[in-house]
Regions:
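Structural detector for helix-capping/boundary residues
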Residues: 64, 73, 128, 199-202, ...
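12-transmembrane solute porter fold
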Residues: 7-22, 27-29, 42, 159, ...
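Short juxtamembrane and helix-loop transition motifs at transmembrane-helix boundaries
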Residues: 97, 125-127, 192-198, 296-300
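Short, membrane-exposed interhelical loops at transmembrane-helix boundaries
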Residues: 430-447
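Central mid-sequence intracellular linker of multi-pass
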Residues: 171-212, 263
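Helix-loop junctions on the cytosolic side of multi-pass membrane transporters
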Residues: 179-197, 224, 247-256, 468-479
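Transmembrane-helix bundle of Major Facilitator Superfamily
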Residues: 1-185, 317-322, 328, 332-342, ...
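Interfacial transmembrane-helix termini
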Residues: 127, 225-227
Length: 481
């Protein structure tokens, strides 16, 4: 790729990616305001967030395959258009049901955008700069995730919760215009094929059903007991559907995801590292806002600024780990990054209610640094094992691994803390923690907090062991383009 075209492409897709990631984090802070306006319970309004997770998990993988078939430019543009339409519907929603439907439309567009963004970027950067490109994308994700809590507070306070959807729609519209002007299918590594001849419909249906049911069972919005008929049935049916999916994908000549990639040790070990790494690293952005607001006494806006320190560490580390991994290989950065994650998870487990702000922000920064160090090199290692024609489905698969790992990590976190609190008679919802002045509730939460991060430290250490098994993959393909 000559000239600076690859950088034009990067900024074109980065605008939309930033908005889509920010949307996912910004909506959580609006849930209480939405519940108040529609006069519904907080449990009911959480379906606004759950609908997004289900939609993205169900459609991410099939949509990645569609992008490989139909051409990435039009796919990316249609995804952004759907996202904007969904945002406008959410802005004008008259009841909770309409808002949830609008979030499904937004998330479908977001799934299309995220399914193809890595494929587009890797398609225009030369193989020798793959790590640098992925590092830049990881930085964009970090900035988007951090911007959500920072922007949400003042925007909701000044203009109400509906305004957050305009905040995410405006940069996406700019991304649509840029995509029409900049993106060229002949240069971003995509080509148009026959959808009917090649699309794996049965695999897509099995994948959507299995992952939707699995995510729904793990997130447990109905508050079933973990040892209950409904929960056990949910896991068993998910397992049956996943087994059926694997059997079908191995038999069909044009699979949605080529499972034979897992025969490559580099692919299988790096994917395992990614999955476990996101389980071990996802609880920080879920639990720390609760800790900062409920125990340290900071408001929503201040909590967002404190959490930004972690995103700053992730963004900075992604920059140099991505660039340097092109020169020195991915292994060193993956080891060090996951090592930082193990260390900070252990450190988090010793936090108490009067932990100093300096210590909290320092550990958050190191935690973000660790995440940034391993994410881009790990992804580069995985993508090095597949050909350009599979970049779309592989980009979607890697995003799916991240999403499912994060959901499992957050569900594991909530289950451990809720279990400890329940065993000690402290039956208080996490969102109501700041309203309780009972010392027993505080002690029970902190005991669950400590156990949670020790468990996550073990999970992250296992991810580190998987990373040690990941070797450099040498291919005779020409990836220079």
């Amino acid at each position: 790729m000559t000239g600076n075209y690859h950088w034009k492409v990067f900024w074109t897709v980065a605008i939309a990616l930033f908005a889509m990631v920010m949307d996912f984090s910004i909506v959580f802070l609006a849930l209480s305001s939405i519940a108040d306006e529609f006069d519904v319970t907080l449990r009911a309004v959480t379906w606004v967030a759950i609908a997004s997770s289900l939609t993205m998990s169900a459609f991410m993988l099939p949509l990645g395959r569609v992008s490989d078939i139909t051409g990435r430019k039009r796919f990316h543009i249609v995804g952004m258009m759907l996202f904007v339409v969904g945002a406008l519907l959410a802005y004008s929603a008259s009841n909770l049901q309409m808002l949830i439907l609008a979030r499904v439309v937004m998330s479908l567009g977001s799934a299309m955008g995220q399914a193809v963004v890595f494929a587009i970027i890797v398609g225009v950067f030369p193989g020798s700069e793959r790590g640098k490109a992925l590092g830049m994308i990881t930085t964009t994700v970090a900035i988007g995730a951090a911007a959500g809590p920072i922007v949400a507070g003042p925007v909701i306070q000044e203009w109400g919760w509906r305004s957050i959807f305009l905040v995410t729609a405006l940069p996406t519209i700019a991304g649509i215009v840029a995509a029409f002007v900049v993106l060229e299918d002949s240069k971003i590594g995509s080509e148009t094929r026959s959808l009917d001849a090649r699309f794996d419909w049965l695999g897509s249906i099995l994948s959507a059903a299995a992952l939707s049911l699995l995510i729904l069972t793990i997130s447990n919005p109905f508050a079933f007991e973990w040892i209950s008929l409904q929960t056990i049935a949910g896991f068993l049916v998910s397992l049956v559907l996943l087994v059926a999916l694997v059997r079908w994908e191995l038999r069909t000549p044009e699979p949605m995801l080529n499972l034979r990639f897992f025969k490559n040790p580099t692919f299988s070990w790096s994917t395992s590292t990614r999955f476990l790494g996101f389980i071990g690293g996802s609880a920080t952005f879920f639990l720390m806002p609760i800790f900062v607001q409920s125990f340290m006494g900071y408001g929503q806006r201040s909590a967002g600024m404190i959490m930004f320190v972690g995103a700053l560490g992730m963004g900075l580390a992604s920059q140099f780990s991505g660039r340097l991994s092109d020169k020195y290989g991915f292994r060193k950065f993956t080891f060090v990054g996951l090592g930082f994650l193990v260390m900070t998870n252990v450190w988090f487990s010793f936090f108490v209610k009067d932990s100093s702000l300096v210590i909290v922000m320092s550990v958050l920064f190191l935690n973000g640094l660790g995440m940034g160090l391993w994410m881009a090199p790990n992804m580069s290692a995985t993508l090095s094992t597949v050909s350009r024609v599979d970049y779309g489905s592989m980009s979607a698969f890697l995003n799916l691994v991240r999403n499912v790992g994060s959901v499992i990590g957050q569900a594991l976190t909530a289950a451990i803390i809720a279990g400890i609190m329940l065993s000690r008679g402290a039956e208080v919802q996490l969102d109501q923690l700041s309203e309780s002045d009972n010392p027993a509730v505080t002690d029970a939460f902190l005991a669950g907090w400590s156990l949670t991060f020790r468990v996550l430290a073990i999970v992250t250490f296992i991810a580190l062991l998987c990373a040690i098994q990941t070797r450099v993959f040498v291919s005779d393909r020409d990836d220079s383009n």
